[in-house]
Every structure is written in structure tokens, then in C-alpha cells.
Amino acid sequence: MPELPEVETVVRTLRGLVMGKTIERVSVHLARIVRQPDDVEAFKSLLVGQTIQDIQRRAKFIQFFLNEDVLVSHLRMEGRYGVYQADDPVEKHTHVVFHFTDGTELRYRDVRQFGTMDLFPKGKETTIGPLAKLGVEPLDKSFTPEVLGKLLKGRSTKIKPLLLNQECIVGLGNIYVDESLFKAGIHPEKPAGKLTDKEVIRLHESIVSTLQEAVEQGGSSIKSYVNGQGEMGMFQQSLLVYGRKDEACTKCGAEIIRFVVGGRGTHICPDCQKNQ
């Protein structure tokens, strides 16, 4: 699933490709992608004539700000956007197409068919939709070691599942939680409330630096992820533990292991991340 760096990269590329374009019509080939409104014809009708004024990321969601509404899109496992000319061949698994007045198209393709789209009147998207209960943005200036410490204080939950909880901190998924915990030297099963002040500071620093580096490198293309221009990310080449089971730790040389925490495959260095 695309995480914060991948979604941020998609947003940045799409801004340069479709901002300012006006929707002439919309084609929906898989109705269940559209959740709000529950009438697909209403969804299509509401979008006609609206111009994309801005595109922003909130957590792992893409927000298309239009004249009257906000389209909130989640890529889920393998959703992707691409911009094409109207006469370009349409790839299999293309489920939604936004046809622009200039003859170009924004196409949404999703092999797994798990992605979602919700259309809300401006101002309502943060109160009644999937954005309503999201936690703090880890790349926002408001995310400080003190804020992280308050989120963890008194929690008996293991640190990894808590970091994956989007109501606490948004945008983190399996890849970047494993990487952040490794850099901070913290075992993923340690109770969140048991982290020392120094560990909280290290964890904060590792979360921010890991995400910033990943954004700079266009995200991680582990499976099918590409940005809005069809380009792969490069951060997978910089991963220190994720996906490196049985390889040597870059810090100490110990063998990286994989096990399950909270139902999620987890990679650690058993020497650098002792459970104590």
C-alpha cells in the first residue's frame, strides 16, 4: 500500500499535470470505487464543469480541490493515477476516467480494486468523511517530540501497531515504521508507554528523517507503485531492514529477521533492537 512518501509524490506530480484543468465528463467503469455520493450518476454529474484548483495530501489520501467540492481518493493497495491523451489506449483495470476540456484524461487504474473515491462539498470533507478522525501529520511542524511523547504516554499497546494507527500518527505503514524503529534502535513489541524520553526523541527524529528522505527519492517502488508520471520511486534502494530478511545489518552485521507483530510482517535487527 502506498504510504505517506508515495502519496505525497503522486500529489506533487499530479499538481503539475492536471491543476487548472476543467472536467468535461467522467466515466466510471467500476461503481464500487465511488462511495460518496452512493449514486454514481450523481457523482459524475456533480464533477462536470468543475476545475481542479489544488491537489493536497492528507495522511494517505489525495484531495482534489474543485470549485465547489473536494474529491477524496485513497489508492489502497495498488491504485494509481496517470494522465493521457484521449486517443491513448486504455489499460486494463482502468476504472475511472476524468475527461478534461483540453482533450487530456486523468485515469484511475486499480488491479486490486480496493481504492475509494468520496466527493464532499468544500468544508465538509474533514468533518463527515474518512478524514474526520485522522491523527497528526508527521511532517508537519506541529509534530514535535513532545507531541509524540504525549501520544505514547500510558499506552500499553506495542509501539509498532500504535505507529500504524492512523488516528494517532498518519501516513505511516509497514515499510516506514520498520525503518523508523530500526533507526531509533527500538524493538517493535516494546509497549509504547515504556519508551524513555531519549527513545521518544530518537523515534521522532527517525520518523521525520526517514519520511523526508523517502519523499526526496520519490517513495519506494516495492511492487507496483509509480508516481503520476509513471515513474518508479528510488527509496527501496535505501531500505535498511524492510524486505531484507537474512541479510546483514548495515550497522552491526547481524542477520535481519522477520516475524509478525500485530498481524503485520516485521523486519528488525535482533542486536540493534533488543526487546528490553
Curated annotation (Swiss-Prot):
Keywords: DNA damage, DNA repair, DNA-binding, Glycosidase, Hydrolase, Lyase, Metal-binding, Multifunctional enzyme, Zinc, Zinc-finger. PROSITE patterns: FPG_CAT, ZF_FPG_1, ZF_FPG_2. It catalyses: Hydrolysis of DNA containing ring-opened 7-methylguanine residues, releasing 2,6-diamino-4-hydroxy-5-(N-methyl)formamidopyrimidine; 2'-deoxyribonucleotide-(2'-deoxyribose 5'-phosphate)-2'-deoxyribonucleotide-DNA = a 3'-end 2'-deoxyribonucleotide-(2,3-dehydro-2,3-deoxyribose 5'-phosphate)-DNA + a 5'-end 5'-phospho-2'-deoxyribonucleoside-DNA + H(+). The keyword Protein biosynthesis does not apply. Its cofactor is Zn(2+). SUPFAM superfamilies: Glucocorticoid receptor-like (DNA-binding domain), N-terminal domain of MutM-like DNA repair proteins, S13-like H2TH domain. One of its GO terms (molecular function) is 8-oxo-7,8-dihydroguanine DNA N-glycosylase activity. A zinc finger (FPG-type) spans 240-274. NCBIfam families: fpg, PRK01103.1. Belongs to the FPG family. This is Formamidopyrimidine-DNA glycosylase. It comes from Brevibacillus brevis (strain 47 / JCM 6285 / NBRC 100599).
